[in-house]
Amino acid sequence: MMKIGVSTLFFWEYPMVEIFDIFRDIGIKCMEFFPENPDFWDNRFDLDYIADLRKEFLKFDVALHNPHIELNPSSLNPYVREAVIKETLWSIELAKFYRCKLITIHPGKRPTNRSPTDEEYEAFFKYLDRTLEVAINKNITICVENMPERINRIGWSPEEMEWILKRYDELLYMTLDFAHAKEYMEEFLESVIDYIKHTHISGVVNRKDHFPLRKSEIDFSPYIKALLDYGYNGMFNLELDDRRLEKNPVTKEEKIEEVIKDIEFLESII
């Protein structure tokens, strides 16, 4: 059976308790939780708030997305790298508390518009070494996400993702972002399908990501079917961006309608 989830970040402007209600009303049983949702982020050090949400999280199948805004695990600035490690270790503890079995992380990038150097890769590998050491002890699976194709990004090509994953074989896994992959989807499935434990899915319009899936100019349905046929039993997580919709602001009811239509579209594929 296809497991369909939705990113909490699509409903970023609402309190977490309201997001839980929205998901329940729609009938969603899976979610990808972004701690950087403003309501949660503003209360992240309030232990009573954190504890009160636990009973709600336990009602869902939850994957966690590591904080990434303003962060870069491949930074050559040691203070930035230290911040990334602190946030990641905090996320691992949070995932354990909320019984999330999986965390998605981003690879790094070179801050200038040039190809990453050996130093950026080395910084990223040191970050992975520390992250995996802690996560494995906590029985948390770490999945690195493929990035959009940019000259300064680590991990956008199938070849590079395969190289990274094989370096940490049986320790590190992958979150496959369909919209980031675009025309490389077939190559990703050919080279790293055994590592895929989680997915992000959305539509691509004019080469831009995170549109409603049903409006995508790239037909991802063959790859969805291929994953399912291969035995993939992870989440297909809708990662939509309200800025890609045709109006601003977008009401809660309009967002709910977009999610319902995309869920129906996904279900129609199989």
UniProtKB/Swiss-Prot annotation:
Transmembrane segments: none annotated. It holds the Pfam family AP_endonuc_2. PANTHER family: HYDROXYPYRUVATE ISOMERASE, XYLOSE ISOMERASE-LIKE TIM BARREL DOMAIN-CONTAINING PROTEIN. This is Uncharacterized protein MJ1188. It comes from Methanocaldococcus jannaschii (strain ATCC 43067 / DSM 2661 / JAL-1 / JCM 10045 / NBRC 100440). The lineage of its organism: Archaea, Methanobacteriati, Methanobacteriota, Methanomada group, Methanococci.
